[in-house]
C-alpha cells in the first residue's frame, strides 16, 4: 500500500542515480554507515521508507548503557557497550545526558547477585562501585527507600532522534545523499550479483531506481523482508517491548534493578520526562508494523516500576509506545532456541553466493557506531578502499564544543530559550537563534521550542511534515502532547514553504491523530481530561473534524508509539 503524498514536501530530480554504496534503513545504524562511508570518501545513498529513526531506533529507553546490564550473562556485549559509552560521551555529547546510574537490590532480590554483578562488571571493564543504601537515597531521593543494596555505574541517557539526525547531517555535509519516504520494493540482480534497488517514492508517487556495486541492508527487524527480495533467508524473531513516558523527570539517575533482566526494571530520565520499561514478548513477524500497548503491559510497567521509584504510581503518564528488538537466529538453529542479541554482519557473497549484498543487524542503539564501522570496513574491503574509520574520534555536528561554551555565545538570550536550544542542538544552536526576531518567538512552551528551531529543522534537518518536525525538535512531545503547539507549528510549516495551506491542515490532522494513538493506552485521569480539552479545542473551535480524514495508508506514514 502507498502512503499519502499530500503530507510531504516535494523533492526535485527523480531520475535514476548511481553511487558506490546503497544503504537501506534510516535508523541509527544506517545513518552511522552513511556517515562512516562519507568520512572515508565513499559515495553513498541512504534510502528510508519513512522518516529517520521510525523503527527500533526511536522506540527504546534512550539509555546510554554502561554495559552493566549485560555483564553477568553477556560479557562481549558488556565490553562493547562500555567502550561505545565512552566514545559517545565525546563525539555525541549534545545527545547525551551524563546522569550516571544506580543498580538497586530490593528485599525480595538476592544480595548474592550483587556480588556476582560487581565481579562481572570488573571483568568487563565497567567501573561499578557498591555504595551504602543510605547514600543511594541521598544521591537519588526518588529511589525505593526499602533498598538493601546499591551499585553506581556509568549509565546515562541519549536521545535517539537527535543522535540519528546528527549522523545524517554529518553524512550529507560530507557528500552522502539521503532519501526519506523512499521505500525499497525489490533488489535489482544481474546474474549472481545485486547491482541496485527498485524503490517507491511516496512523496511523488512514482517508482525510482538506484544503482551501486554494493547494497547494505541495515533495515533492522525489517531486514529479513529485504533479504527475501533476493531469495535469502535471515530468520529473525521479533521481541516486542512496551514502555511508558512519565510526565516529568521523577529521577536524576538511571535506576536499574540489580537482578537478572526482567520486565520494567529500568527507569531512565531524559529531556523533560522519564521512561519506564520495558516488557518483552515474542510477536509474529507479520505484526512488526502493527504493535499496540496492551492494558496488561501498562499494568506490569506500573506494578514493577513503582518498586524502583514509589512516586511513579502517582505520576501522570503522557503516553505509551512499543518497539521491537531484532533477535537473529543462527544459521544452524532456525528454530530460534539460540537467538543472538549481539551484532550480526553477513557477507552474502560468502554465505549465499550472492555478490554485492551485505546485511548488518542485531546489536543495540549503544553499539550503532561499532556496527557501522564493521559494515563500512567490509564495504571498503569489497571496493578496494583503504581509508580508516574516524567516527570514534570526530565529533558529530553539535558536539564540537561543550554546552557551557555554546551558552556563553548566546548569553544575551532569555535563559529558557538559550538552555533548551543548546541542550538539543549543542554547538549548532547559534544557527537557530541569530537570524531575526521571529526566531525567538515560542512555538512549544512545554519543550521551549522556538520558531527559529523550527526554521533550522526545516532548512538543515530534512523535515517533510509535522511528525518529522517532532523528531527533530520535540514539538508536541511535552506535557500537553501538542495541544497548544501543533497549530502554531503547522502555520510555520506553511510560512517556511514546507507545505501549502491545505497540506499544513492535513499534516495537523495527521499529527494530532498520531499523538492520540500513543495516549489512548493510558487514557485515564489527567491524560483523558487533557485529551478531551484538546479534542474540544481542535474539533469544536478550530473545526479540524471538517478536514477529510487520512486513510490507513497515510497513517502508516505518520506512525505513532514513539516518545
From Swiss-Prot:
Classification via PANTHER family: ANAEROBIC GLYCEROL-3-PHOSPHATE DEHYDROGENASE SUBUNIT A, GLYCEROL-3-PHOSPHATE DEHYDROGENASE
Species assigned in the record = Haemophilus influenzae (strain ATCC 51907 / DSM 11121 / KW20 / Rd)
Q: Name one GO biological process term.
A: glycerol catabolic process
Name by which UniProt lists this protein: Anaerobic glycerol-3-phosphate dehydrogenase subunit A
Q: Report a single Gene Ontology molecular function.
A: flavin adenine dinucleotide binding
Which Gene3D superfamilies does the record associate with it?
BFD-like [2Fe-2S]-binding domain (1.10.10.1100), FAD/NAD(P)-binding domain (3.50.50.60)
Q: Where does the chain bind FAD?
A: 20-48
Q: What is its main location?
A: membrane
Topology relative to the lipid bilayer, per the entry, is: Peripheral membrane protein
Amino acid at each position: 500500500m502507498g502512503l499519502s503524498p499530500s503530507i510531504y514536501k516535494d523533492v526535485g530530480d527523480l531520475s535514476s542515480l548511481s553511487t558506490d554504496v546503497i544503504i537501506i534503513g534510516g535508523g541509527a545504524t544506517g545513518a552511522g554507515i552513511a556517515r562512516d562511508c562519507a568520512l572515508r570518501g565513499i559515495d553513498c545513498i541512504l534510502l528510508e521508507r519513512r522518516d529517520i529513526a521510525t523503527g527500533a531506533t526511536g522506540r527504546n529507553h534512550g539509555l546510554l548503557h554502561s554495559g552493566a546490564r549485560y555483564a553477568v550473562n553477556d560479557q562481549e556485549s558488556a565490553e562493547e557497550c562500555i567502550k561505545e559509552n565512552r566514545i559517545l560521551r565525546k563525539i555525541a555529547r549534545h545527545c547525551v545526558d551524563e546522569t550516571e546510574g544506580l543498580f538497586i537490590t530490593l528485599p525480595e532480590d538476592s544480595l548474592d547477585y550483587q556480588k556476582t554483578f560487581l565481579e562481572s562488571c570488573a571483568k568487563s571493564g565497567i567501573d561499578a562501585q557498591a555504595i551504602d543504601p543510605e547514600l543511594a537515597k541521598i544521591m537519588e531521593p526518588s529511589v525505593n527507600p526499602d533498598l538493601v543494596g546499591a551499585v553506581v555505574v556509568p549509565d546515562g541517557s541519549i536521545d535517539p532522534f537527535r543522535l540519528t539526525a546528527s549522523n545524517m547531517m554529518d553524512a550529507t555535509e560530507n557528500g552522502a545523499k539521503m532519501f526519506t519516504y523512499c521505500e525499497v520494493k525489490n533488489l535489482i540482480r544481474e546474474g549472481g550479483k545485486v547491482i541496485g534497488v527498485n524503490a517507491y517514492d511516496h512523496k511523488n508517487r512514482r517508482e525510482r531506481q538506484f544503482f551501486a556495486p554494493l547494497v547494505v541492508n541495515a533495515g533492522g527487524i525489517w531486514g529479513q523482508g529485504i533479504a527475501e527480495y533476493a531469495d535469502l533467508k535471515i530468520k529473525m524473531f521479533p521481541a516486542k517491548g512496551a514502555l511508558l513516558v512519565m510526565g516529568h523527570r521523577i529521577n536524576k539517575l538511571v535506576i536499574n534493578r540489580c537482578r537478572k533482566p526482567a520486565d520494567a526494571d529500568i527507569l531512565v530520565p531524559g529531556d523533560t520526562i522519564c521512561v519506564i520499561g520495558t516488557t518483552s514478548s515474542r510477536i509474529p513477524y507479520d505484526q512488526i508494523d502493527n504493535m499496540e500497548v496492551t492494558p496488561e503491559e501498562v499494568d506490569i510497567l506500573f506494578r514493577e516500576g513503582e518498586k524502583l521509584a514509589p512516586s511513579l504510581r502517582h505520576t501522570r503518564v503522557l503516553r505509551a509506545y512499543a518497539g521491537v528488538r531484532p533477535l537473529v537466529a543462527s544459521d544452524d538453529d532456525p528454530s530460534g532456541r539460540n537467538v543472538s542479541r549481539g551484532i550480526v554482519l553477513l557477507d552474502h557473497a560468502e554465505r549465499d553466493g550472492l555478490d554485492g549484498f551485505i546485511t548488518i543487524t542485531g546489536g543495540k542503539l549503544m553499539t550503532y557506531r561499532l556496527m557501522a564501522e564493521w559494515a563500512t570496513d567490509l564495504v571498503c574491503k569489497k571496493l578496494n578502499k583503504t581509508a580508516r574509520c574516524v567516527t570514534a574520534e570526530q565529533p558529530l555536528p553539535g558536539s564540537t564544543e561543550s554546552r557551557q561554551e555554546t551558552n556563553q555565545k548566546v548569553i544575551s538570550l532569555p535563559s529558557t530559550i538559550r538552555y533548551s536550544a543548546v541542550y538539543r542542538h549543542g554547538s549548532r544552536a547559534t544557527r537557530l537563534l541569530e537570524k531575526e526576531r521571529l526566531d525567538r518567538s515560542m512555538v512549544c512552551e512545554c519543550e521551549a521550542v522556538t520558531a527559529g528551531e523550527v526554521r533550522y529543522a526545516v532548512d538543515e534537518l530534512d523535515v517533510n511534515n509535522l511528525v518529522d518536525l517532532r523528531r527533530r525538535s520535540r514539538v508536541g512531545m511535552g506535557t500537553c502532547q501538542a495541544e497548544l503547539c501543533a497549530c502554531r507549528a503547522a502555520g510555520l510549516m506553511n510560512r517556511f514553504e514546507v507545505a501549502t495551506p491545505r497540506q499544513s491542515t492535513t499534516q495537523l490532522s495527521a499529527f494530532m491523530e498520531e499523538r492520540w494513538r500513543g495516549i489512548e493506552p493510558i487514557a485515564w485521569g489527567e491524560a483523558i481530561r487533557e485529551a478531551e480539552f484538546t479534542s474540544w479545542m481542535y474539533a469544536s473551535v478550530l473545526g479540524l473534524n471538517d478536514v477529510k480524514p487520512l486513510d490507513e495508508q497515510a497513517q502508516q506514514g505518520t506512525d505513532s508509539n514513539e516518545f
